[in-house]
């Protein structure tokens, strides 16, 4: 493939997540998705904001933020939309949202401009029970105060076969 020059280069922007705790801040990067969920099997309550505008107090198993490349991975399995990788977007997909008289959470994914900042603030009682999953790798942080997710300015170069067609592959694998 490489020796025969039978490839194209696709540039993609990963997600950048800034995990802020009472003690420090750590940046993480994901090509596919960042998932915020509970360490144990219990409902999380999260304050969700987009560009500093409150969306809602979310209650459910967690929240998944994906890139267009990641839209066909865990995001799709969680009920999110498949996004054409040529589009400059972020996707926010709820995981098992609660909808009761006491809790109202959105039930479908939200597609946002890649210029958006997604802020997630856990209720104080959940600050030590959150698992951050980055492209399948699990991370635990103590005393999380907030999590901010943006499209990174970094560019990754993916080698693709010259005959790679996104929608053909989607139709073969998923539809």
Name the predicted role of every residue range.
Residues 1, 10-18, 29-31, 46-47, ...:
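Short amphipathic alpha-helical surface micro-motifs
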Residues 1-61:
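Catalytic core of DAGKc-family lipid kinases
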Residues 11-15, 30-32, 42-46, 61-63, ...:
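A generic structural signal for short beta-strands and their flanking turns/coil linkers
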Residues 20, 36-37, 49-51, 66, ...:
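Short beta-strand-to-turn element immediately C-terminal to the catalytic PLP-Schiff-base lysine
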Residues 20-23, 86, 151-153:
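Short acidic-glycine loop/turn motifs at beta-strand connectors
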Residues 28, 36, 41, 50, ...:
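ATP/nucleoside-binding phosphotransfer catalytic cores, i.e., glycine-rich phosphate-binding loops
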Residues 57-61, 65-102:
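Gly/Ser/Thr-rich active-site loops/lids in small-molecule metabolic enzymes
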